[in-house]
């Protein structure tokens, strides 16, 4: 776990609980897609970057769930990299109390403010209009925003009726 794996000419991934994409901008500069779930993930990612003589220029967050932005704060302090995402995800990244508040429907009680639901705040520096050259944003809604629950829909999963709420992509 936490090993760098090459999958294309300029593309890699770091094997970890929330796999991290890595794209080479040139021989030394890279961007990563998401940053893992906490400071320790950030530390391990930073170690891999140093071992490969990579300079982190960007973190591109796919969304603001804590397991995708938890390493942002550590990596941004260490590397002064830029952090970019959509405008709304940037707000959740800058003000992580929004994540458990959104989940709970109000100000969260203490047990909802753990590292699994609330990452350390980091400072987004731009939005997806500022993607590095060679990268393109393709919206694939459905994992967080752009999804809604429908309690009146039932599917058959593996031939067995599945009566629980299903997420529909808008």
What are these regions (language model features)?
Residues 2-52, 154-170:
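Conserved beta-strand hairpin/beta-sheet module of binuclear metal-dependent hydrolase folds
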Residues 91-153:
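Metallo-beta-lactamase
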Residues 18-19, 65, 89, 151-152:
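A generic "binding-loop/recognition-motif" signal
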Residues 40-86, 129:
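Active-site metal-binding motif and surrounding structural segment of the metallo-beta-lactamase
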Residues 38-40, 64-69, 90-93, 163-166:
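Active-site environment of divalent metal-dependent phosphoester hydrolases
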Residues 33-36, 57-63, 84-87, 146-147, ...:
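Active-site neighborhood of phospho(di)ester-bond hydrolases with catalytic His/Asp-centered motifs
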Residues 8, 27, 51, 78, ...:
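Short, well-ordered coil/turn elements that cap or connect secondary structure elements
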Residues 6, 13, 85, 139, ...:
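Structural signal for conserved beta-strand scaffold positions within catalytic alpha/beta enzyme cores
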